[in-house]
């Protein structure tokens, strides 16, 4: 590169960029290599479709301006941005080594992962650089919100940089991002998402990135996130209900994990603590014993870049039509597939989610997943109750009623029938027989309600029914996951789980004290 070309500012003229191979894609964006003629330099251009983006350009440009002021060797450099028709083009540094996810897939495809995908020294070297980048972001009041192998890029010299900082998350929130350090926006990929981000109750801070970092550490060793086989809603349930995942979670062949030692496992467990306050900061993690195994970038260059697929090899695997957008996107073969903002339909979790969607019997129950990952801020007030349902709700009273008010969602022609005791084998043969249930909880006026409804195995889904209860204004939107999880528990084992009491994510208000007996901050779901 000549001195003259290097001194030139980055062009904002579309004609100065020659688009080349597609090297990555998501539902709302495509990333292409390009050649910038005035600068005589190859770059990466992320083309974001603005068609469905609710963010004003003024707000979006402010965020990009803040992003462009981030200068760190472990953060991908953003050069400039401009609008081309209905797309926002982000011009970035091209890292020709691709993502760590590309390398993981390449190793797995060649069958070279039987003893673990990457060794400890390689993992430590990559993750130390990621921590340096996260420490910089966190010190500057920024949260990445989507740390994963697919967003860790490698340069041909073995350098490591974090990508997709800022803009993807900003677009997903409709621009509703303040500069404070606590977020209440629901963005990120479910498998890597921290529990507090899923709960949407207290908001979250930079410690959410530390959880995602821990999941990424597992991904680099095993080749996938712990719950990668499950569709998004199931991932949310497992993360919230189960103990934190570990290196062994979901791995059938434990032999592949034998070479990973105690310090690596301990580092992961520190990151994956459900209480974010107990997780270490990026700066504290950098002092962890495990990172003494880290080498330099020449080590990465020799160790894994020689095994990595080339840009042209990676580009052949991108099947989505560039420029397609939306939650349901069209593929090259003309079919439609669902994904979240940056969902990789080649990944295991992508396949599971798409399979879940295709098996949905009705559009009504498919919508729950689409709404869960919509750009709208999920932290709004309780949904308004439609008039036809509000007529059945109890009227305001000075004291809480001794008997719960009855709210029925059962079809008028088919009154609720008591579920008869049947063996699990008999029930599986009679999948069309509905289970009558009652959800008892307090409404916004603190009055007890009994909400009666039916669940038909083989037709209904727990998340679909829960979404309907929320849409009817009977359940707080923040309780979607916890209600769905307990409904799933009952319908899977109706004989052993005829009634469950559980804590609500929406919690209690003011001076109220949670009480599972009086159902203050709790709900009860039973087979009637």
UniProtKB/Swiss-Prot annotation:
Give the Acidic residues compositional bias ranges: 334-348
Q: Where is the active site?
A: 146
Annotated localization: Cytoplasm
Q: What Pfam families does the annotation carry?
A: OSR1_C, Pkinase
* Positions carrying Phosphothreonine: 185, 310
Composition-biased stretches, type Polar residues, lie in 396-406
Tell me where it mainly resides.
cytoplasm
**What's one GO-annotated cellular component?**
cytoplasm
Which residue stretches belong to region Disordered? 313-350, 394-429
Protein kinase domain span: 17-291
Residues the entry annotates as binding ATP: 23-31, 46
Is Cytoplasm found in the keyword set? yes
Residues with the modification N-acetylserine, per the entry, are 2
UniProt cofactor(s): Mg(2+)
What EC number(s) does this enzyme carry?
A: 2.7.11.1
Q: Which residues carry this modification: Phosphoserine?
A: 324-325, 339, 347, 359, 428
Q: Enumerate the catalysed reactions.
A: L-seryl-[protein] + ATP = O-phospho-L-seryl-[protein] + ADP + H(+); L-threonyl-[protein] + ATP = O-phospho-L-threonyl-[protein] + ADP + H(+)
Modifications made to the protein after synthesis? Phosphorylation at Thr-185 by WNK kinases (WNK1, WNK2, WNK3 or WNK4) is required for activation. Autophosphorylated; promoting its activity.
Keyword set for this entry? Acetylation, ATP-binding, Cytoplasm, Kinase, Magnesium, Metal-binding, Nucleotide-binding, Phosphoprotein, Serine/threonine-protein kinase, Transferase
Quick check: keyword tRNA processing in the entry? Answer: no
Single annotated GO MF:
ATP binding
> Which SMART domains does UniProt cross-reference here?
S_TKc
Q: How is its activity regulated?
A: Activated following phosphorylation by WNK kinases (WNK1, WNK2, WNK3 or WNK4).
Function of this protein?
Effector serine/threonine-protein kinase component of the WNK-SPAK/OSR1 kinase cascade, which is involved in various processes, such as ion transport, response to hypertonic stress and blood pressure. Specifically recognizes and binds proteins with a RFXV motif. Acts downstream of WNK kinases (WNK1, WNK2, WNK3 or WNK4): following activation by WNK kinases, catalyzes phosphorylation of ion cotransporters, such as SLC12A1/NKCC2, SLC12A2/NKCC1, SLC12A3/NCC, SLC12A5/KCC2 or SLC12A6/KCC3, regulating their activity.
Q: Which family does it belong to?
A: Belongs to the protein kinase superfamily. STE Ser/Thr protein kinase family. STE20 subfamily.
Name of the protein this chain belongs to: Serine/threonine-protein kinase OSR1
Organismal lineage: Eukaryota, Metazoa, Chordata, Craniata, Vertebrata
């Amino acid at each position: 590169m000549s001195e003259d070309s290097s001194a030139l500012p980055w062009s904002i003229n579309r004609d100065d960029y020659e688009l080349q191979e597609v090297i990555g894609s998501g539902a709302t964006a495509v990333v292409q290599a390009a050649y910038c003629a005035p600068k005589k330099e190859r770059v990466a251009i992320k083309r974001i479709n603005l068609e469905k983006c609710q963010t004003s350009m003024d707000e979006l440009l402010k965020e990009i301006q803040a992003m462009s002021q981030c200068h760190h060797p472990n953060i991908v450099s953003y050069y400039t941005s401009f609008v081309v028709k209905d797309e926002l083009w982000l011009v970035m540094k091209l890292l020709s080594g691709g993502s760590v996810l590309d390398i993981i897939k390449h190793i797995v495809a060649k069958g070279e992962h039987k003893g673990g995908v990457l060794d400890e020294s390689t993992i430590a070297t990559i993750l130390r650089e990621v921590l340096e980048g996260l420490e910089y972001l966190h010190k500057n009041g920024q949260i990445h919100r989507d740390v994963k192998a697919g967003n860790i890029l490698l340069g041909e010299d073995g350098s490591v940089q974090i990508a997709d900082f800022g803009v993807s998350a900003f677009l997903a929130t409709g621009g509703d991002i303040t500069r404070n350090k606590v977020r209440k926006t629901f963005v990120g990929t479910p498998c890597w998402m921290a529990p507090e981000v899923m709960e949407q109750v207290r908001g979250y801070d930079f410690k959410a990135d530390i959880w995602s970092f821990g999941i990424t550490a597992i991904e680099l060793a095993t080749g996938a996130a712990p719950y990668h086989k499950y569709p998004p809603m199931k991932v949310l349930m497992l993360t919230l209900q189960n103990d934190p995942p570990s290196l062994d979670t979901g791995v059938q062949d434990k032999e592949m994990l034998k070479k990973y030692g105690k310090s690596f496992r301990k580092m992961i467990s520190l990151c994956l603590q459900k209480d974010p306050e107990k997780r270490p900061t990026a700066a504290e993690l950098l002092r962890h014993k495990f990172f003494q195994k880290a080498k330099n970038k020449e080590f990465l260059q020799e160790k894994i870049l020689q095994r990595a697929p080339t840009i042209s090899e990676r580009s052949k695997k991108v099947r989505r039509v560039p420029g397609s957008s939306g939650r349901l996107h069209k593929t090259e073969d003309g079919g439609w597939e669902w994904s979240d903002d940056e969902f990789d339909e080649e990944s295991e979790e992508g396949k599971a989610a798409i399979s879940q969607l295709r098996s949905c019997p009705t559009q009504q129950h498919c919508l729950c997943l689409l709404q869960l990952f919509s750009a709208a801020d999920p932290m709004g007030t309780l949904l308004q109750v439609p008039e036809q349902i509000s007529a059945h709700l109890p009227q305001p009273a000075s004291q809480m009623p001794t008997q719960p008010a009855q709210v029925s969602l059962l079809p008028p022609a088919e009154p609720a029938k008591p579920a008869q005791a049947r063996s699990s084998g008999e029930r599986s043969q009679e999948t069309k027989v509905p289970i009558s249930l009652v959800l008892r909880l307090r409404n916004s006026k603190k009055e007890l309600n009994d909400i009666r409804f039916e669940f038909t195995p083989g037709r209904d889904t727990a998340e679909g029914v829960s979404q309907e209860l929320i849409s009817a204004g009977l359940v707080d939107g923040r309780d979607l996951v916890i209600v769905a999880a307990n409904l799933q528990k009952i319908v899977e084992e109706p004989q052993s789980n005829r009634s469950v009491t559980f804590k609500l994510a929406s919690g209690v208000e003011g001076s109220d004290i949670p009480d599972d007996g009086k159902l203050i901050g709790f709900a009860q779901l039973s087979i009637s």
